[in-house]
Amino acid sequence: MLSHSRVECAFKTLSVAKFGGSLLDVEGKGIPKIIGQIREIQKRDGTGPIAVFSAPMGCTDALIKIGESHAQECGLSLDPVFEIYDRLAKLYVKGELLKQAQEEIANYKALTQTTLDAVNKRFSGNIKARTLTLGGELCMSMLMDYILRSHGLESCAVSMENFPVVTDDNFEDAAPNYELSKKRLDAFVKPLKEGKLVCLAGFFGITPDGLETILGRGGSDLTAVFASCILKDSYQTKTLLYKDVPVQSADPKVVRGQKTDHVKALTYNEAHKASLMGMKIVMSPAIAWARRFNQPLMVVPIDEPEMFSVIEAQNSSGEIVKCLTGKSGCAILSMSDEKSRSFEDSLRIWERRNDFMDLGAETMETGEHIRDFLFLDSEFLKKNEERLKGFDENLKIEYGLGVVTLIGDKMKDSPGVASLAIGAISGINIKRGIFAPHTSQIILVVEEKNVAATVAAIHLKKQELNKPPAWPIGFQPLK
């Protein structure tokens, strides 16, 4: 039987709003916009919201550099990072709260420094997770609590001790545990019932025995989606992922002079493929949780919130090609087919990498069987090339490549898309073509220097690409 408290809030709408690093610039120009959006959400919902915050732009990379310097015994100072928090506090925290906020910032700096002092030759594991979050998301969410209270909003920050995102102990790429996290819902529900909004650190998790973890790059998306999922039994949750620009048919900086279209709706599959191939809409683990719990996601541009995009299981859009993405920094690795199985298993199972794809095997004129893999992150290969040669000392890597991808679930029922795309780039050398419209993507591998030109040329044909196929009279395609 449901408890009274469960029934009381069962139909209340609760928004979980994530504000990423691009909105938390080091000068604080995005903070008034964030405050404005939180006010709008409160006015609309009457409850919450839960506001998930990333670290300020550039802070995570700066903290990684500082941590690695301590591993080399030439430790860089934390001052440049914490000066950002001091500056934001002076700009946006008022009265007595300013002194309290500055004391909290100093405490986070001391905790971060103590953690760095424990670095011994390697900046990794729990020490890395603790450093990045103490100096990043935990400090930022605390500061945003003070900023919001200074602007007349009742808020609270979730402490490390009560943190409701419980994870495994894969410290640098942790996976949330649904059942264990559900047991800590009071960290959300209690302040929400008291009429407060909740400031939550993104990217951060904690093991059942209290050790700090991080959720991997883009982990703040996962924090917001996961929080929405574990609260679905108590609230009608909405997940709002605030960005600086709307989701568009292509990057306007790449297709200069062309009109881009606002992408109003994407399926989970389309969003996953677009993000993996360079669009960075929502990170893959967050999409996986949303799909599992059928949780719609709204990607909201903070300056034009009416230009939001909805990501859900299915949508009624008639577009064949939703968007085009371009990604540089790719490579093709070629190795013995016989040795490729253990190589692939090692990367997928032990390294937990899914940013590469099998291009298939071919038989050379020598009779040797070679298998090729497309890697979307050539830096990983450069850093680990010697180690990877342990699988095949004769493996070869072609660097300097990029990928251009056409995204759309409806391509599987629309012949001719690939030929139109290829016809648009007759002057560009296609290194490889992965024509798999049944997977909602057509991938063209080109030289890195040609990525932008390829995207621009194909985008010019987008209207033509989205015309339904003109079948001959009386002809029906096979289903």
Give each language-model segment a name.
Residues 21, 161, 203-204, 245, ...:
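A broadly conserved detector of short glycine/acidic/proline-rich loop/turn motifs that flank catalytic sites
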Residues 2-282, 287, 445-447, 466, ...:
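Nucleotide/pyrophosphate-binding catalytic subdomain
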Residues 309-479:
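A conserved regulatory-domain signal marking ACT and ACT-like small-molecule sensing domains
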Residues 13-15, 48-51, 154-156, 196-199, ...:
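Structural motif
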Residues 45, 152, 195, 232-235, ...:
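Glycine-centered loop/turn motif at secondary-structure junctions
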Residues 35-39, 229, 291, 422, ...:
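A structural alpha-helix within SAM-dependent methyltransferase catalytic domains
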Residues 9-10, 192-193, 292, 326-328, ...:
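A generic structural signal for short, non-catalytic loop/turn and secondary-structure boundary residues
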Residues 268-344:
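A conserved active-site cap/scaffold subdomain adjacent to cofactor or substrate pockets
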